[in-house]
Amino acid sequence: MTVSASFFGTDGIRGVVELRDVEEDEAIRLIEDERTLTPAFMRLVGEALSYTQPHLPGEGSVVVVGWDRRPGNQALVRALTLGLRLTGSRVVHIGECATPTLHRAVLVFGARAGCMITASHNPVSDSGIKVFDTFGYKSNRAYEADVSQTVRQLAEEDRDVDVVDREALSKPDEDRPQWSETAHRTWLAERWGQFESMFGSWTDAAPERFASPFLIDCANGFGATWLAAFLREHGVDCLEVSSPSAVLNEGCGAGDLSPTATWTHDEAKASPHQMIQALPSAPEGQLVAAALDGDGDRCLLVQATKTGFAVVDGDAMAAMLLEAAADQPWSFAASIESDVALFGHAQTLNPDTTCTETAVGDRWLSYALRPEDGGWLHGSTLPTCGIEDSGHVVLPAPHPSAPD
């Protein structure tokens, strides 16, 4: 099978959600010809993921499933769960979460795979699926081709399920709806301590560089109820401008921001983007806001300029990070869309820093930075950083079960 026949794109499978009941051959036609995603197709994907598990690293059959807040996601999750459980997977639901939370859950639960039901910064009429392996790396092209081929083969078979079994198997083996927020808060607290040990404390180094209050925009998503409160607990004077009761990604979030965007003060006040409209006047160079995308795996900052505001993109964030720890060499990766001067700057800061250029997509950053065996990073391979100008930042984190 050729990669071109794969259902997967740059970052998983995505499509406009239609919840009508269709035959499986029609479900395949819809996703291929009309970019339309149906529960029938998601069931096929679930079955295919189970059947192809032997081609993934790791052991066991646990699959962790999380999702962002889109109106069609519950039906898609039920269909995916049905497919997974029909073919022998043990399914754990962790409820609404960010994509990094799902990544963390794969490690915490020792899962063979993880599935995030999301379409990232796309409108809520869309959804899709991102797949992670037991090490937390996103699926590769060969595996995606394997899954796609299996989907096509399954659609040619008769696999009817009676109503009673369908209802039972659409529910997870283990339901942990409150797990995500608690786990993500705990994880961030650990990371905060690690960053302070590496870069110094927030109160000593950072406040004068940030507006007060500093605006946070979680795109009306998972972090909108708790992230600003977490940051305030750690000394950051900040304010969340999005709302969990509003529509995901609508008039907010990083998805509507270009890495090169700028605004005058008047343009910002007239912007339909909720966070941009609320930006406070600030001294030139001061950071005034941060926006996440819908599934929380991408971030862009906004900085005050002489005449208004400008986006601080992933390249600029990487430069800040490398400058803050220039006393040690980094393994650094950036996509082909990054500024051509970025690698030169990294090696000027520390000549022993190694730089790798990748294709577009944060998974390629992870692949470039991981060990040759595709497994865990170890202390001897740190520090590492991958960046896209769109705001994907890839950094290593201690395994949740690793000793202190």
What is the meaning of each model-derived region?
Residues 94-96, 149-187, 305-397, 401-404:
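Proline/glycine-rich low-complexity loops and linkers
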Residues 16, 127-283:
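Gly/Ser/Thr-enriched, mixed-charge loops and adjacent short helices
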Residues 10, 67, 216-219, 292-294, ...:
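Active-site flanking residues adjacent to catalytic metal/cofactor-binding acidic residues
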Residues 131-134, 300-304, 394-397:
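Short beta-strand-to-turn element immediately C-terminal to the catalytic PLP-Schiff-base lysine
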Residues 55-126, 229-302, 358, 369-374:
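N-terminal small/polar loop signature for handling phosphorylated ligands or for N-terminal nucleophile
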Residues 1-80, 86-87, 113, 170-214, ...:
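An N-terminal, well-structured beta->alpha segment
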Residues 16, 72-73, 101, 123-124, ...:
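Flexible loop/turn segments at secondary-structure boundaries
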Residues 7, 112-116, 215, 287-291, ...:
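Short glycine-aspartate micro-motif
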